[in-house]
Structure formats: C-alpha cells, structure tokens
Design a protein with these regions (language model features):
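Glycine-/small-residue-enriched transmembrane alpha-helix faces in small-molecule transporters
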Residues: 2, 6, 12-71, 168, ...
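Membrane-interface interhelical linkers
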Residues: 2-46, 79-111, 161, 213, ...
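C-terminal-most transmembrane helix of multi-pass membrane proteins
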Residues: 14, 21-27, 74, 280-314
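Hydrophobic alpha-helical transmembrane segments of multi-pass membrane transport proteins
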Residues: 45-53, 57, 111-128, 190-201, ...
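Membrane-interface helix termini and inter-helical loops of multi-pass transporters
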Residues: 56-66, 95-98, 129-132, 174-175, ...
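Hydrophobic/aromatic residues within transmembrane alpha-helices
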Residues: 61, 69, 73, 127-128, ...
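Helix-helix packing/entry segments at the starts of transmembrane helices
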Residues: 137-142, 209-219, 257-292
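C-terminal transmembrane-helix exit sites in multi-pass transporters
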Residues: 142-162, 284-303
C-alpha cells in the first residue's frame, strides 16, 4: 500500500519540477536528500520574505483601516486559495478529509483554533498602521522560543544546554523591556502566547496546514462579507471604484497563499530544527520594516532588550 499523502505528493511534484529547471550547479549537486534540503531552505527564505512584504502591505492600502485590510485580505486569500486548489486539482483531496468528520464533537475540535488564527491575521494587518509594529515583531521573535517551551512541557521534548541558554537570554530580554516600559505590549503577549496554541492544536488534530487554512478562511468568509456590507460599506465603494485597489487586493490574496504554500512545503522538506531556525527570518524582517518603512519609534534603550533576544536566537 502506498504511503503517499497529499503533502508528500505536492512536495515530490515540486522537487521533480525544480530538478528540470536550469539551476546553478550548487542546487543540483549531491544526493537527492541534499537537493531537497537546499530546496527547502530556499522555500523557507522565500516564504519569510513574502511574509515580510505582506507586513508592510497594509501601509500602501490607505485610507483603508487595518481592520478593513484584514477583512479584504481574508476574502482575497480565500478566493486565491480556492482558485489554486481548483487549478491544481487538489480541492477534492482536502474536501475528502473534511467529509470524514461526522460528529459535532469532531467539528468543534477542528474549529477550536480558528479564532486564534483570525485574531493573529487581524493583528498582522492592524499593527503596522497603528504603531504596534515593533511590539508585534517582538512577539514573533519570541514565538519560536515559546514553541520550544510548549514542546518541552506538553510533549516531553528535551532541551539542550544551549537551548536553555537561548530561552534564558530571551526571558531576560523580555524582562528588561517590561522593566523599561513598566508594562508589556498586549500585541507581544498575544502573538507569543496564543500562536503556539494554534499550531499545537493543529498538530494534535493531525490536519494538514492547507486543509486547516481552507477551513479557517471558509468559516470566516460570510462574516467578512457581512462586515463589509453593514459595518464598512464605504470600503466597498472605494475598492469597487478603483482598479488600483482591486489589483492590490488581488495581489494581497495571491501573495498570502504563496507565502503559506511555500512555508508548508518548506516544513515538509526540512528537518524540524532547521525549519524552526529559518522561522527567525520573518520577525527580523518585521522588526526592520516596522522601524524603516512604517516609521515606528525605536529608542536606544531598546537595544539592550532586543539585543538579548537576538542573542538567544543566535
């Protein structure tokens, strides 16, 4: 009996396609395992770069508010994901997984992480235009380390001395920031405190990332439409009368799906520890964009706090 899954099929097809491209010798030399590793690293870098672009994207969609951009992004992402699955012929594979859920308890368990997902995507679009860019980036810096802690506590994973040292540096950095500001940003806490819960729940459910994403977006789509009709009808007129906004929102949806797709493929190709380390590229980009592009304030006293966090990451 074949042990191929939809994700394995997708990964194998991608690897086979890449192998036919005229790539540099370093990409094609070595064993198949080495080539897969190189391709996984490339996809991880691409996905993190795309997420960095998406973080600054909302600043180019003024006068839409951060919440309105979030609503439009969810709808554009849903449409782009459905289009991708239809064109690739994989929609049926994901629907078959959902058809296997036959009880209310199974569906309730499946939908439990959805509010966390939606709140995280809202914060991702709201923070850059509301002065919370640096604080949100700090949450993403802490997210991988929080995953290590959750893995240790919930799954009995063992930490090496270096990993404990990294967690310690990050903890001191966060503590320093709390002392400096005499508070801690709710955006930082929300990212590092709830996003790991989302991934842990999806892991326990054993559902693929694309299937989970399809469920999350489909459930939210009617609420997004209702919001535009009854709460923010002005944004409908603004978007509908502007080819610029239509193209920008279409690009937002396609970039979002591409970012998620490359991220999922990278997670299938890379060892867990390598994939985890690659995930630090995104918060570094978010932090830089928050300061340079979005104009969020950065005080010299923050160097100590963030320096300790970066030291833990290194």
């Amino acid at each position: 009996m074949s042990n191929l899954t939809p994700s394995n099929v997708s990964t194998n097809m991608l690897t086979a396609t890449v192998s036919r491209l005229p790539l540099p010798a370093v990409w094609t030399a070595g064993s198949a395992q080495q080539r897969t590793l190189i391709m996984g690293v490339a996809l991880a870098i691409l996905s993190n770069l795309l997420f960095g672009v998406l973080y600054a994207y909302s600043s180019f969609l003024a006068p839409l508010s951060g919440t309105q951009v979030f609503i439009w992004r969810m709808l554009a992402m849903w449409a782009a994901l459905i289009g991708y699955l239809l064109i690739s012929g994989r929609l049926g594979l994901h629907l078959d997984k959902l058809k296997a859920l036959r009880t209310v308890k199974q569906w309730a368990w499946l939908l439990l992480p959805t509010p966390i997902f939606l709140s995280q995507f809202w914060l991702f679009m709201w923070a850059p235009v509301n002065g919370q860019g640096v604080q949100t980036a700090m949450g993403y810096f802490l997210f991988p380390l929080m995953m290590v802690v959750f893995g240790c506590v919930l799954f009995g994973e063992k930490l090496s001395r270096l990993q404990w040292l990294a967690v310690g540096f990050a903890a001191v950095g966060v503590g320093s920031e709390i002392v400096r500001t005499q508070s801690v940003s709710w955006a930082t806490l929300w990212v590092c405190g709830t996003y790991p819960v989302y991934y842990i729940l999806r892991r326990l459910q054993g559902i693929g990332a694309i299937t989970g994403l399809l469920v999350d977006l489909t459930i939210f789509a009617p609420f997004a439409v209702a919001y535009l009709l009854f709460v923010a009808p002005s944004s409908l007129g603004l978007v509908g009368s502007s080819s610029f906004f239509i193209m920008m929102l279409a690009g937002l949806g396609m970039l979002s799906v591409l970012a998620m797709k490359t991220n999922v493929d990278a997670s299938q190709m890379l060892p867990v520890n390598v994939y985890g380390m690659m995930s630090y590229i995104e918060p570094a980009l978010l932090f830089i964009l928050a300061i340079t592009v979005l104009g969020n304030p950065f005080e010299s006293a923050m160097i100590y706090s963030y320096g300790l966090i970066w030291l833990g990451i290194a």
